[in-house]
Amino acid sequence: RQVNAGALAQLTEREREVAGLAAYGMSNHEIAEYLVISPATAKTHISRAMVKLGARDRAQLVALAYQHRLVDPPDPTSPTAP
């Protein structure tokens, strides 16, 4: 799914951050602990990012985060790679 540049520009810094953390596999609770915010706030940021990017679910948000380089893909040569 393509997202126009305007939609990407609408994301706040925090929405980009939580989308990236979700892409790294973190739950809302883990994101909240990492950013020292409440789980409800983490969920709100995820939801708003999904709406702005037109993602129908968290999996699509993660795919869009990688596709539009909100996060870098994991390094397959890393010792922590699956």
Where are these regions (language model features)?
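Regulatory hinge/linker segments at domain boundaries
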Residues: 1-21, 72-81
